[in-house]
Amino acid sequence: VAEPLIQPLDAYHSPKVDMLRLDRFDALAPGNKWFKLRENIAVARKQGARCLVSLGGAYSNHLHALAAWGHHNRWPTAAFIRADEAQVTPCMADLRRWGMRLVHLSRSDYRRRHDPEYIASLLRGFDRPYFIPEGGANALGASGCADIAALLPDCGADYSLIVTACGTGATLAGLASAVAGSTRILGIPVLKAEAFMARDIAQILDDLGSPRKNWHLDHRFAGKGFGRVSDELSEFILRFEAQQRVPLDPVYTAKLCFAVDAMHKRGELAGESRVLVIHSGGLQGRSGHPALFNQSVLGISGQCSGTTKQRSNF
């Protein structure tokens, strides 16, 4: 039985809080990843590309989704990955199993990922590649994320505030470009991004032709930085999953829900009529923290038996 995408979080009242369960949306590229990939893949098809190429870290949700989709659709994929040659993570094992070609980059080389000339030099060894930026974070990825709003009644008009985690900001930009006019978007950065994220989101919105000002960022919840899980966050994850029976990933949705929980308890959401939290998927990341998620009532997989995910058509 396919479960509904919108689920109330019963612990929260005044205001009520719902969750959009994008982790239930697509088995190959769950969460926001399908939305970021779809328009990029459409352009790659039009260009006659023979290989989809991207980059990311050793636990990348984006690369995991891209490799799974490529394997299923028999389209070669490759990735420049920030990892040592000897490093093996559960995510990387999946990438290799699905046939993704991995090219290892040092941390210093990976820092050049925004340099067009450097990327062009990396792509020279590929046959008709189509390059997708880190996390699918380009205007096409954000444009795809605009379709998330279409999953909500009246494009989210029932909600005064929609809250989403931010890594690159592309999901927030897409949502901000498409939600109902009265709805505001709050982004929770999961990395220390005060110096650049707001600028990057504004640029993406300009690229989309939608320079809306209906969004803002709250940088208080980045914690120790990207992918870092503190003892306090670990305790919250276990408590939240036991109470709500909603699986969280350790990088994005854990910090997102921690932030919403903290703001609700402090009364910072008291002026809102209704709040929606975006579950952006990423549950494959649980496998990188077995000691933590083996303690969860949901286990490492975070999956409940007897349910199926809704499928996309790409």
Predicted segments — roles?
Residues 1-304, 309-314:
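PLP-dependent amino-acid enzyme catalytic core
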